[in-house]
Amino acid sequence: MPSNQEARLFLAVLVLAQVLPILVDSAAEKGFKQAFWQPLCQVSEELDDQPKGALFTLQAAASKIQKMRDAALRASIYAEINHGTNRAKAAVIVANHYAMKADSGLEALKQTLSSQEVTATATASYLKGRIDEYLNLLLQTKESGTSGCMMDTSGTNTVTKAGGTIGGVPCKLQLSPIQPKRPAATYLGKAGYVGLTRQADAANNFHDNDAECRLASGHNTNGLGKSGQLSAAVTMAAGYVTVANSQTAVTVQALDALQEASGAAHQPWIDAWKAKKALTGAETAEFRNETAGIAGKTGVTKLVEEALLKKKDSEASEIQTELKKYFSGHENEQWTAIEKLISEQPVAQNLVGDNQPTKLGELEGNAKLTTILAYYRMETAGKFEVLTQKHKPAESQQQAAETEGSCNKKDQNECKSPCKWHNDAENKKCTLDKEEAKKVADETAKDGKTGNTNTTGSSNSFVISKTPLWLAVLLF
């Protein structure tokens, strides 16, 4: 007969045998409350906005480049209208600056910005697809209105999808039509993802206590296993959720403080985060107006050195002195003053149409401004042709008057037809070329017999008479 001690031990073993099957995680195999799935919906919705944000950013960049091109064209038009003045030279400097800024912006758009936005869109769309598929499985896995994988806030009832919401929470589970929209960063920040559950569920924080959900366990008791538990844990939602192959609650990956890595179980989350934080947008220096002094603006110093000073590596003081000739200073205020003159410059009414604005600052669009610029360039070309034709007789007469003696006095730069330079000569290197002198004399005689020349320039015809040269100059 067993002793009292043995009887008590036997009774304890019987009780333990009855209790052990219950001593599993009370959250295992149970449905998920709204506290768990709502943040996933919020991330999904924000990822859905990434293609819209990309379109918004790319269009903004293109618009800024177009504005720079328009500014360059307006300045060029102003220079043509005011041809021959220092204001025109200032406008050429302005035009060159904006043309170079436009090129810089276009290069940034092609080489950097477009690649960034496409990468961010691709990684965000992929991650969204993985999240949406998981949420869709949770939504559909239910036994009744009170037992399933996706439960309401209290865990009392399963939730349903209506339009673009689940249980009243915005959660479309699909991509929206792509329309430009300013990008947001509410749930996907610089450090990681904001608001997602990030700890094991030890106290039924996001698992319900009685709603069954086979997607929450890898065990064969009310889980994904059949005759036995799964061979290993299963990851879901692109590595965010890990379903154990035992009767324990799911665990989730902490995503609020990510590190750059490769090959991680939650790699899609890392890739989308990396791509998003790498975005520079259309606010970088290539797309912004410059507030530096005139010499510090893109392209200005190089143009002044090469076109005006004709001297590379010029001193800063030399460049500033040269700029003062055209801007009355070298600070940003003088630049702004020229831009104001350009903006207020009127153009011919026939170029823009009746009852349309005629000030340059009110005109935009590459096609319109290019046409206006072509008009004024043709007009300038016509005026220049008039002067060229007027100058020919005087030039011919000067050439015809050259003698051996006058040629002998010229240096190499002055020695021009009908004079001829002889490098090997010892003394008189510039001499009169008799054959060339005869040709000049014949041409001069021919010009003297011709009354006038009819030349067409721009849209106007100019009748060239043998009038004094000073009259032609008045055309400017």
Curated annotation (Swiss-Prot):
Task: List keywords of the entry alphabetically.
Answer: Cell membrane, Disulfide bond, Glycoprotein, GPI-anchor, Lipoprotein, Membrane, Signal, Trypanosomiasis
Name the SUPFAM superfamilies on file. Answer: Variant surface glycoprotein (N-terminal domain) (SSF58087), Variant surface glycoprotein MITAT 1.2, VSG 221, C-terminal domain (SSF118251)
Its GO biological process annotations read:
symbiont-mediated evasion of host immune response
Compositional bias of kind Basic and acidic residues: 435-449
Q: Which residues form the propeptide?
A: 460-476
Which residues have a glycan attached per UniProt?
N289, N454
Could you tell me the membrane topology recorded for this protein? Lipid-anchor; GPI-anchor
Q: What is its main location?
A: membrane
Listed GO cellular component terms?
A: plasma membrane; side of membrane
Give the residue range of the signal peptide.
1-26
Q: Which domain of life is it from?
A: Eukaryota
Q: Where is the lipid attached (GPI-anchor amidated serine)?
A: S459
Annotated region (Disordered), positions in chain: 389-418, 435-459
User: In which residue ranges is the amino acid composition biased (Low complexity)?
Assistant: 450-459
Location(s), subcellular: Cell membrane
- What S-S linkages are listed for this chain? C41-C171, C149-C213, C407-C419, C415-C430
Q: What does this protein do?
A: VSG forms a coat on the surface of the parasite. The trypanosome evades the immune response of the host by expressing a series of antigenically distinct VSGs from an estimated 1000 VSG genes.
Q: How does it assemble?
A: Homodimer.
The protein's name:
Variant surface glycoprotein MITAT 1.2
Please name the source species.
Trypanosoma brucei brucei
